[in-house]
Amino acid sequence: MENERVEREQSQFQEDEFIDSRKPPPWRKQITVRAIVASLLIGIVYSVICLKLNLTTGLVPNLNISSALLAFVFLKSWTKVLQKAGIATTPFTRQENTIAQTCAVACYSISLAGGFASYLLGLNRRTYEETGVNTEGNNPRGIKEPGVGWMTSFLFVTSFIGLVVLVPLRKVMIIDYKLTYPSGTATAVLINGFHTSKGDKTAKKQIRGFIKSFGLSFFWAFFGWFYSGGEKCGFSQFPTFGLQALDKTFYFDFSMTYVGAGMICSHLVNLSLLFGAILSWGIMWPLIARLKGEWFPATLKDNSMQGLNGYKVFICIALILGDGLYNFVKILFFTGRSFHSRLSKTNSISTLVEVPEDSTKESDNLKRENEVFVRESIPLWMACVGYLFFSLVSIIAIPLMFPQLKWYFVLVAYLLAPSLSFCNAYGAGLTDMNMAYNYGKAALFVMAALAGKNDGVVAGMVACGLIKSIVSVSADLMHDFKTGHLTQTSPRSMLVAQAIGTAIGCVVAPLTFFLFYKAFDVGNQNGEYKAPYAMIYRNMAIIGVQGPSALPKHCLELCYGFFAFAVAANLARDLLPDKPGKWIPLPMAMAVPFLVGGSFAIDMCIGSLVVYVWKKVNRKKADVMVPAVASGLICGDGLWILPSSLLALAKVRPPICMNFTAAH
């Protein structure tokens, strides 16, 4: 379904008679100073947004389309201002737009996938204490406090190797196998659409919509700050459905970030979140809380992993693992079947680069795209030398940072990385699903078990980061190569842009994280910045070390049940006809509110409701404007984080505490 939609969109922009057919500029001229500046600014803003989303719920929508729109807005405005000032400037091309978008995505992807809210943050003392100092397997040797220096070094050591691991196979995967990479194709469709006469008019409407929603969101966040001068104060604690519902986390917290995210995510994701919130906070946790004294000691603290909090964390993990394992096996199956069928074709050589015969224009476009993509190749020796160099650096540096992870474990990880990266990138090209987190979780369990009780927690989480980083970056690069292929952008300039963005991200991400870490109460399970995945990853490592003995009473049986439910739900959605199948909830989305509460699920559903009503009133306008308006809501609220965190660091507190109590 997704692939068919993308192919329809692709054919639409290829049919536009006004599409830019000029010869692409040389690859060095595609990388401009203004594109790097634009990507730096977008990367910083989106790094803040990604970290806020990661540290609050861990659920982050795909922001690639949004970043392409912002890159167009920034560079188009730049060229127009200079032209009005009478300053000569080079034309703004779709290749430059692609470079800016690629560089920006590479930058904020480090904040998104760098482990700041999961496996790296899970090493700190607070998460160790929240997990339970008396929990077997939760060794005090497994503590490493966050630091700008070691985090930046770790990112530089681990983030670049994924850029070179699959470079030799780019032609095979993009041209020969014709993998669609739906997200990369959709981004290319958007960028190509901008650079047409019709697309320019549409872009102006989107820019106006973005500016209005951005202003509204930023002003609302600024206004709401004045009323949040204390714990559980402000509009974020507004008892929309009453005080009892507020205690169960069911309320609208006026977060424009999550309303915007809900507009981007599908209705199924948002409804799955709400279903998970109702099932957990509305039914299960109140029932289990009544069993205090029977299932777990009544004297335990609320945050004890042997009490109610343990059920929240481990059942959430069971859903995540069940969903992840099913999709992992499914993607491997489809990848293997597709790969085998291609290899078994006797006439594969003649059909690999076949050109459509029904449209001369489409045929010419495809020829130009393939020609540009193949002409400016990246030398094989460069990729091999780069992989060996970064592997050697990692094998030396990572055991120095983390003595618990021995050098030979790092060596094994890098020997396995190319094959794992290929499987993941091939699967992502078919399904648009990046399974890097599941490869990382597999590495976590294996390494935690191998390293033993004393070193297992740290070794497991760091190994998870190594594998996930390589596998994720290589798949993202293939998405970018697909975008570059369809916008006739040189692979060399794409790789350089990705490297520049990654380098910027390795500096920006730790600094942005420490803005949150110093200004806000990160890791407080009763606060806004719960960092749920730090707790989840540390507990997964403990399970890897200890096995099921780490779980509270009857929790293992519940985990088995929810693991089976996750597998069954995915199986039902794949096997049932489309009509009933589309209503089966997504276990991965259901799992998030199990730990963090239901308020953000209500925000997301309100975003979904806005999109639903808008499409009922004017579907054509909604299809054009929803991404722009949603991006504005996310960026406005996200940008307010910068001044609010600086005020918090300066000890400037909001003047008013608005909260609500019962009248009697």
UniProtKB/Swiss-Prot annotation:
Entry membrane topology: Multi-pass membrane protein
GO biological process: monoatomic ion transport; response to iron ion; response to zinc ion
Any Pfam family the entry gives: OPT
InterPro entries the record matches: OPT, YSL-like
Top-level lineage group: Eukaryota
Expression sites by tissue: Expressed in roots, leaves and weakly in shoots. Restricted to the veins, to the central cylinder of the young roots and to the pericycle and the endodermis cells facing the meta-xylem tubes in older roots. Expressed in the vasculature of sepals, petals, anthers, stigma and siliques, but not in developing seeds or in meristematic zones.
Family, similarity comment: Belongs to the YSL (TC 2.A.67.2) family.
Stated role: May be involved in the lateral transport of nicotianamine-chelated metals in the vasculature.
Protein's recorded name: Metal-nicotianamine transporter YSL2
Organism: Arabidopsis thaliana
Lineage: Eukaryota, Viridiplantae, Streptophyta, Embryophyta, Tracheophyta
Gene: YSL2
